[in-house]
Amino acid sequence: MRIAYDVDGNAIEQYIKSSSSSIVNTQFSRTIRYIETQSQYNEIPTSITDLLFANGFGSTLYQSLNFPLFENLTTIDFGEESFSEVATLSISGLNKLQSLIFRKNSFTFSKNSYAERTNRQLTIKNCPDLTTISFGDYSFSDYHSIQLQNLNSLISVTFGEYCFYYSNFTFSCMI
């Protein structure tokens, strides 16, 4: 059983993972997909609204990551210690995206630590409905650059300890 949470940490539902790890929440008109395996990732429907990655997912699978085909996404939740080898993450043009959650030690080689790697970059731009971004402790701790651009609805950005420790920040066209 897994409990899904909204961005404030409130439980919105409980469900038992099916073989497809996909559920439809009729109360909120949302389709949630919990990703634990590479094959589940490869089969994500473009109509998905909520994407939740398991702890440790994608740690050695990807060098870069983006989500251009998922125009209905409202939430992306990256589990703890996920996507450690991704050097470039770009989240752009997701017009319905409202919430991004990066859990502890996600997108970092330096688990519970920090080190400078000049080739790692995060870009989040052109997501007009994005209101909340949350970075867990040590997430992106070894990234060199973060760029947030054209996020007109952004209300809250929360940084845990040691996130983007060596980064240059660029916040532009935020309102």
Question: Language-model features: where?
Answer:
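Residue-level signal for glycine
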Residues: G9-E13, L148
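Position-specific detector for the leucine-rich repeat
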Residues: F57, E71, S82, N95-K96, ...
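Acidic/polar low-complexity surface segments
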Residues: I101-Q121, E161-M174
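N-terminal segments that cap or nucleate solenoid repeat domains
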Residues: S19-E81
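Leucine-rich repeat
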Residues: T60-Q63, L100-R103, D129-G136, L154-G160
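Conserved hydrophobic position(s) of the canonical leucine-rich repeat
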Residues: I48, Y62, L73, V86, ...
